[in-house]
C-alpha cells in the first residue's frame, strides 16, 4: 500500500475537526521477533520512521518473547523526537501465557513442559514506567529459563503464577492486551465459548 493511501486512511478515520486523533499502534514486531521463529521483516529503525512519517503519536514494540530490540528502539526514538517531539515509544513484550506445569525430563536428559500446542496464549504486556520494564525483564527471564523445543519450535512459557509472583506485589506498572488470534480471549471467542 502506498504512503498516500495510508495517509488518506489516517486522515479519513483519525483526523476530526482539523486535529489528529491520538493514535498509537500497540502491537508491532521487529526483526527481534525472529529469535526463535522467523516472524517479521520489519527493521526497528524503519518501523519507527514509518510510524512517525504516517503521523502516529507512537507505537509499542512487542516482539515475541524478546526484549533485545528495546535499546536500539529507544536510541532511534530519541532521534525521531528531534523532529517529532511528541512521538512516544512504548516498550512491551508478547508473551506465551500458559498454565503452570512441572518440567519433564526425557531419557536423553532433555527438559520440556507437557503443554499442549494450543495452550500457549499470546498476551501483550506494555511497560508504563521503569518498574514495568523491570517486571517485563523478570517475566522474560523466567520464560527463557524454561526454553525447550516442541516439534521443532522453541517454546518459552510464561506461567500464570509468574504474573502473580512478579506483578501482584507491585501492580499498576504494566498494561495487558489480548494480543491476536493466538490470545486466550480470541481462541475462546472463535470456539464459541462466551462464558470463558
Predicted regions and their residues:
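Phosphodiester-processing cores and adjacent nucleic acid-binding clamps
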Residues: 5-196
Amino acid at each position: 500500500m502506498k504512503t498516500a493511501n495510508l495517509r488518506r486512511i489516517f486522515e479519513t478515520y483519525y483526523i476530526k475537526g482539523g486535529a489528529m486523533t491520538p493514535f498509537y499502534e500497540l502491537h508491532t514486531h521487529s526483526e527481534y521477533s525472529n529469535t526463535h521463529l522467523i516472524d517479521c521483516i520489519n527493521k526497528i529503525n524503519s518501523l519507527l520512521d514509518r510510524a512517525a512519517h504516517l503521523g502516529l503519536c507512537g507505537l509499542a514494540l512487542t516482539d515475541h518473547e524478546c526484549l533485545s530490540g528495546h535499546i536500539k528502539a529507544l536510541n532511534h526514538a530519541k532521534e525521531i523526537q528531534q523532529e517529532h517531539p511528541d512521538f512516544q515509544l512504548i516498550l512491551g513484550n508478547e508473551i506465551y501465557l500458559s498454565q503452570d506445569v512441572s518440567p519433564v525430563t526425557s531419557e536423553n536428559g532433555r527438559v520440556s513442559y507437557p503443554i499442549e500446542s494450543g495452550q500457549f496464549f499470546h498476551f501483550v504486556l506494555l511497560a508504563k514506567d521503569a518498574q514495568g520494564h523491570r517486571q517485563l525483564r523478570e517475566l522474560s527471564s523466567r520464560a527463557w529459563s524454561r526454553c525447550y523445543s516442541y516439534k521443532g519450535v522453541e517454546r518459552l512459557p510464561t506461567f500464570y503464577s509468574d504474573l502473580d509472583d512478579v506483578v501482584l506485589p507491585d501492580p499498576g506498572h504494566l498494561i495487558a492486551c489480548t494480543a491476536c488470534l493466538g490470545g486466550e480471549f480470541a481462541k475462546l471467542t472463535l470456539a464459541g465459548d462466551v462464558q470463558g
